Amino acid sequence: PGELCQSDFTDMKALGVTILGKPFDHLVYHFVLTYSNWETGTICFSESFESLSGGFQNGVWELGGVPEKHRTDRLTAAVQKPDNPEEFTQRYRALLKHYGLQGQKTQPASPNENGDVEQRNYRLKKALEQSLMLRGSCDFISRQDYAVFLKKLFVQLNAGRRDRFKEEVDLLRRLPVKRFDSCKRLQVRVGPSSTIRANHNVYS
């Protein structure tokens, strides 16, 4: 109890969620405590470090404490390429250090090592699909409206895990004084048409 948490990104496109009638293609960063299966999630749009960091931190701050270890699959936002001498990326190492965590990654072609969260991904989508059917619509008035709906679902899913969750919470370590700053700061030049280029994208 209180030792290991796992996380993963899961694609929610197949559920057909819409915002004011427009398709809302998104991912959920899914965070799970492996002993109790307590879970939570954060809406995001890419498997970037910012999404990983934001989702992880939302998870532990909602928990109110920090487990000993965090395991992911071989996300490029966290894990270096095989030919790199460092196991994890610099920014992910900084995140682990900030929370005093031991990082773990799955071995190549062994997603079963992240099995708890992989199984919860499947069950989350099934539960969300059923909740949307009971609601009678997959359309929401805003992203926040959908986020509240998703949050209520996590509360329902966690309701039957209270006893084992209590065992975990009692063993979690204290949170740091503040969150880790996961923003990426860029120095850019303004182009001739009042545009800027950042991360290979042009913005006006």
Where are these regions (language model features)?
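Mobile-element integrase/transposase regions
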Residues: 1-39, 50-54, 185-198, 203
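Active-site beta-loop-alpha junctions of metal-dependent nucleic acid enzymes
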Residues: 24, 41-69
